[in-house]
Amino acid sequence: LMLRPIETPTREIKKLDGLWAFSLDRENCGIDQRWWESALQESRAIAVPGSFNDQFADADIRNYAGNVWYQREVFIPKGWAGQRIVLRFDAVTHYGKVWVNNQEVMEHQGGYTPFEADVTPYVIAGKSVRITVCVNNELNWQTIPPGMVITDENGKKKQSYFHDFFNYAGIHRSVMLYTTPNTWVDDITVVTHVAQDCNHASVDWQVVANGDVSVEL
């Protein structure tokens, strides 16, 4: 379980929800042509979070199968200098690969779980940074839900379903940057045990931290 960050005296959050640039990769050439290295060509504005399928009055976009690209320029607050900076996506359906400027920082398979990466080495406080995301919505036997992609008589990819709902896709939940101190708690595990007579109980706990920390229970 990955807990959602909240603002605290030692953690600031910058939401990246809003309008992003969006492009279809109809020829599946974006990776080979390294689209993340410059502004997306022939892009249009799209709302994040949200399904790309329902944001345009175009059946070809609604039923599109393959890679799509999102991009946004983001300003890193000058006050974040000296802090650890993390880029987090709450959900990307069904596969996402992320670049910060020209650096690939993470990829994730699974459209319903969050993922994040420490991007401190790739950003400079007080300057802007380009975030690019390649999203793939194709279903296969390993995705949830499963499915397959077929090619119609016109050579166009088409989703084949084994379930009773539409394959909505895109950056489906919030995107954010957040800070932590350079010494931070990375994970907390708490396991409780209750005796059958309910008269005794014990608690096992484990804290994983980066750096030397003291923990008060």
Short names for language-model regions:
Residues 21-47:
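Predominantly extracellular/luminal regions of secreted and cell-surface proteins
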